């Protein structure tokens, strides 16, 4: 199985998406520490 075909499988895409969202939340919390505490 080729490497590019492996990168297009669902677990790899899901893992990359999870890492991207986690990093995004960390960066948002670094600049706006109380953003997730506000009651909506």
From Swiss-Prot:
Protein topology in the membrane: Single-pass membrane protein
Gene Ontology annotations for the cellular component aspect, listed alphabetically: cyanelle thylakoid membrane; photosystem I
InterPro entries: PSI_PsaJ (IPR002615), PSI_PsaJ_sf (IPR036062)
Keyword list, A-Z: Cyanelle, Membrane, Photosynthesis, Photosystem I, Plastid, Thylakoid, Transmembrane, Transmembrane helix
Cross-referenced Pfam families: PSI_PsaJ
Any one GO biological process: photosynthesis
Transmembrane segments: 6-26
Cellular compartment(s): Plastid, Cyanelle thylakoid membrane
Xref: SUPFAM superfamilies: Subunit IX of photosystem I reaction centre, PsaJ
Main location: plastid
PANTHER family noted in UniProt: PHOTOSYSTEM I REACTION CENTER SUBUNIT IX, PTHR36082
HAMAP family according to UniProt: PSI_PsaJ
Function, in words: May help in the organization of the PsaE and PsaF subunits.
Record-stated family: Belongs to the PsaJ family.
Protein name: Photosystem I reaction center subunit IX
Organism: Cyanophora paradoxa
Gene designation per UniProt: psaJ
């Amino acid at each position: 199985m080729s490497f590019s075909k492996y990168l297009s499988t669902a677990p790899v895409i899901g893992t990359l998406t999870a890492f991207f969202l986690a990093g995004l939340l960390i960066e948002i919390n670094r600049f706006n520490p109380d953003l997730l505490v506000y009651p909506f």
